[in-house]
């Protein structure tokens, strides 16, 4: 399993006009269940998943997103990662830190799996 934690991204997301005015800071963590059998034999990145490509894909996807809810963003992103990087399972956690202090919470996040 590949685990990438707390990837910093920007996305235009929210319900309030002030939220949609400028992109918000979010973090994405993703677990990609993928067989290491082939890459373990060959030691060739072409037989595995390049972490840098995953990170770049996540940042570009979020940067292009323009929507209202983090639930939809998380679901679409998770599905897109699974399609682009063939895997048995993708588990994604999307954190929205903007209102954590204002609401007296330790975290605001959604988790989705495909």
PLM-predicted stretches and their roles:
Residues 1-114:
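N-terminal, polar/charged subdomain of small-to-medium soluble alpha/beta proteins
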